[in-house]
């Protein structure tokens, strides 16, 4: 609970004074002029105006999404819980978990919100098997980004500056036993690319270093790394803001890798206008309906400080790295803000936020490439147990010889992170481990159907590379050789279906052409097949019955 203390200045003056100091500390980052009422301890509380009624700030709010999850998708823990116990509750849990009283401050915290395909699909309002198609559809929309005032933005209902902006007071927990420190793991980063004027959005982890400092991992190639390196080369701090507590649709947008301004991308995936507001200590615009925002800058010293180790999204530890340092200048939040943590790494990799988000993102990227490489892709699945990117399954209908191999090559070209590609015929469900295993066992000959490619750019986090960046990739053609998939031996046995054409007699049915036994039962409405057996026996005895190579019955033609 916040203690109020007497202010020696007018509320407006105090508000401006509280915001000027962190702006100067941030090496000249621009501060905003704010109309606010100020409580003690550097906290600014904004009052919404009537204009806020024009925008629905709850439609894409994380809290509302979590509140509407059914019981099979969320576990609610109302009792107080120590931060040290959070990770154990989340590990291997198929549900999202909502902690109502986490840590000494008894704050609300939710974890593993995007740790299942069904929950992400629920955020998009579609069934899980329609998720990637819906994302592809929304990417074609014309988005709208609407800027709102600070007074209207729920994210500015509470503003903490100066000493009161304290990262150690947030419900941030140690996630893995050998992690270097507690990590903020669900942070969406927002920066401005000066070269293009675009807002860049991504996902970062933030290792706590103190009350107002974290490490930020930029070792992997990314737009943010390129933007930061240019800023550091000019000896300038890079303004950056992190959103913590975002709707699954926004999180999906953050992991997409498209060469576009990514604020309109967020709006496109929402299929609704995106309300944004300018931050209080920099000029970055962030979603006005977020739960928390951490404002600040990356200092220009470059990859100067140790960061890590950390349990990475592939299920192993990443080593200590040299990374930039983030300096906090303000914390803004809703009055009833819900903090968020993402599950990353561990033995239950397929249930983690990062693996599921990565998987859906990979599927969308790969589909776009497949549409160019082959005429008819049917389904794509990036297995979450491989981190959502290493093992990829593709179902397609082959139109010409070589389609399967073209698909394999397209997958490798579309994403350097894809390591193994499995291509199957339409009768195989790519989401079924059992069916994929069966296809590998019965339709694959290694000397004929294995495609190996070496010297390929790969993900450095792959432990099998032993620290390298170049590796090999494998394609598994699990399709029937072109033109042979319709033969009897390639068909999958299934219970008979009796919906064939009806005939006045068995002889009339056989006169039309070869028929399977089930077709003959349908032809005369037989419910047990006994009369069919007897009738066929009579024809056989009369020397009139023949069978073709697939076992279908037909009447022998007169010589």
Residue spans of the language-model regions?
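Short capping segments at the starts of secondary-structure elements
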Residues: 508-518
């Amino acid at each position: 609970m916040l203690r109020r203390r007497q202010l020696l200045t007018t509320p407006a003056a105090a508000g401006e004074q509280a915001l000027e100091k962190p702006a100067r500390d941030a090496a000249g980052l621009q501060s905003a002029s704010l109309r606010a009422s100020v409580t003690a301890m550097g906290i600014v509380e904004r009052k919404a105006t009537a204009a806020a009624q024009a925008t629905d700030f709850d439609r894409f709010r994380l809290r509302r999404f979590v509140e509407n999850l059914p019981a099979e998708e969320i576990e609610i823990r109302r009792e107080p819980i120590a931060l040290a116990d959070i990770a154990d509750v989340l590990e291997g849990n198929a549900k999202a978990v909502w902690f109502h009283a986490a840590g000494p401050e008894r704050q609300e915290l939710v974890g593993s919100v995007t740790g299942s395909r069904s929950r992400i699909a629920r955020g998009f309002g579609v069934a899980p098997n329609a998720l990637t198609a819906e994302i592809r559809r929304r990417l074609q929309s014309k988005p709208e980004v609407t800027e709102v005032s600070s007074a209207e933005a729920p994210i500015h209902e509470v503003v903490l500056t100066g000493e009161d902006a304290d990262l150690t007071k947030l419900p941030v927990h140690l996630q893995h036993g050998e992690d270097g420190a507690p990590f903020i793991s669900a942070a969406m980063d927002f920066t401005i690319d000066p070269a293009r004027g675009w807002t860049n959005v991504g996902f970062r982890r933030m290792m706590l270093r103190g009350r107002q400092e974290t490490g930020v991992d930029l070792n992997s190639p990314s737009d943010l790394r390129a933007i930061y390196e240019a800023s550091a080369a000019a000896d300038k701090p890079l303004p950056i803001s992190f959103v913590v507590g975002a709707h699954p649709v926004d999180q999906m947008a953050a992991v997409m890798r498209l060469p576009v301004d990514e604020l309109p991308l967020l709006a496109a995936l929402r299929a609704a206008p995106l309300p944004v507001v300018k931050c209080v200590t920099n000029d970055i615009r962030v979603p006005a309906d977020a739960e928390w925002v951490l404002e600040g800058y990356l200092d220009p010293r470059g990859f100067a400080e140790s960061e890590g180790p950390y349990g990475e999204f592939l299920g192993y530890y990443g080593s200590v790295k040299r990374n930039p340092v983030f300096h906090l200048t303000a914390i803004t939040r809703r009055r009833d803000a819900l903090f968020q943590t993402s599950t990353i790494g561990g033995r239950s990799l397929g249930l983690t936020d990062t693996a599921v988000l990565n998987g859906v993102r990979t599927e969308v990227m790969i589909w776009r490439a497949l549409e160019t490489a082959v005429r008819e892709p049917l389904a794509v699945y990036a297995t979450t147990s491989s981190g959502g990117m290493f093992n990829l399954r593709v179902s397609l209908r082959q139109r010409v010889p070589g389609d399967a191999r073209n698909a394999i090559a397209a997958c490798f070209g579309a994403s350097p992170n894809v390591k193994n590609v499995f291509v199957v015929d339409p009768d195989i469900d790519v989401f079924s481990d059992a069916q994929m295993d069966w296809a590998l066992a019965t339709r694959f000959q290694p000397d004929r159907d294995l495609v190996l490619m070496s010297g390929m750019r790969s993900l450095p986090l792959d432990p099998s590379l032993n620290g390298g960046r170049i590796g090999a990739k494998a394609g598994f053609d699990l399709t029937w050789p072109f033109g042979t998939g319709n033969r009897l031996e390639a068909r999958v046995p299934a219970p008979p279906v009796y919906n064939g054409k009806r005939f006045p007699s068995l002889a009339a049915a056989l006169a039309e052409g070869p028929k399977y036994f089930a077709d003959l039962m349908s032809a005369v409405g037989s419910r047990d097949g006994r009369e069919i057996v007897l009738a066929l026996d009579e024809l056989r005895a009369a020397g009139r019955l023949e069978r073709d190579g697939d076992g279908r019955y037909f009447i022998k033609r007169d010589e």
